[in-house]
Amino acid sequence: MTSSNLFITGCDKTTEWMLPWFIHNFKKHNTTPLKIFDFGMTNDMKTQIRSLPKSSHSDRRMIISMKDVQSKGWYKKPEAMFRASGMAEKVCWIDTDCHVLDNIDDIFDYTEPQKLGMVEDKPWTMRTGGKFHNSGVVVFEGTPPILDQWRKKVAEKN
């Protein structure tokens, strides 16, 4: 493990336009390390991210390639989360369209070992009658078995 807490995000070329804005807002309020999983970003964006001013919580390997994963876009998320579970004791995935307005480190206080922390997606639940969860922010401690099941199910279908 390289750290006790870690924030992660990821994007491809279709959603990378939000990344500089996201990183700016995240770093303005937080010092916990952030890693970005490359789901198919352009070389220009990777260069732009690598040229951002370094801060005390930056790390030389901020961008992590996911070229070896066959799935596309969002479907790489569970694999990125699974890989990140080996990088820190507690991990929080946060989508790049989340507007970080303050320090959010206290999210790690809500983890339970081997469980995913997510909220119910009420609009989808109401629309479908089944229970849906929002995966825009997901916090976890360790490598929850449900995370491994999620990534394997996605790999089978994509």
Model-derived features: positions:
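Glycosyltransferase catalytic domains, chiefly GT-A lineage
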Residues: 1-158
